């Protein structure tokens, strides 16, 4: 046998081996397909279990909950009822804890109530809503502190600064948490007072009564609902604090007025890690030791001498 014949024979054996390997693969192709179908079903089941576990830290409104600790089982919509007992100083402290509390402690209904308790609703609510209530509160507090330091007697500046800072720890009274009269503008408030007076109701809030749309009847003035039994006032607007998720899971329903809205309590993801921390720290500057140089300049700008400057900077 020549060399060329041997090469041809080797090439023929190589082709036979390739053909036989392809046939073997085709014979085993159907069983593999069956295994793939089983594996696909198992994969779906596993994915479903993973989704259920992941959704364990989410409520029906698709808002994330706290991932660990005793608050993991608390529905998101209940946090506003927990945080409404806190002062502005406490809310700012909560916002520094984690992403979720930063989101929950910035609730507009909380800061609107604190703002109106401290300063009253001096301007039409539509104009005020051009900015967030939290920002309005912090800006107004900072302006008041600067103005107080400029105008108060230099000998008593320390005490005035202490008194002004103490206002940040003012929490709502029980009557202010069940009654929304404090957040009404003067025009609507006058209408509410006249109606209550005509029905023999006083302006004092009743704290032992829980208003519900299923058991109470109401008199309505615009978006204000007045309980005919107690006279307690509820404002049902974009910042309504009494909303819950409907059984269908697609609308938020006020438990007092029955008004529905499609506004869900959704926590938006930050653009980058640590974004919420930076924002919370900036907002907390007025309440903490941050931005000391800026406040030192503002508080000491009108000091007459070095001794007065030193006394002022103790509280910067």
Curated annotation (Swiss-Prot):
Residues 22-64 have a biased composition (Basic and acidic residues). The keyword Lipid metabolism does not apply. Pathway: Protein modification; protein ubiquitination. Residues 68-114 form the F-box domain. PANTHER family: F-BOX ONLY PROTEIN 3, F-BOX PROTEIN 3. The F-box is necessary for the interaction with ASK proteins. This is F-box protein SKIP31. The lineage of its organism: Eukaryota, Viridiplantae, Streptophyta, Embryophyta, Tracheophyta.
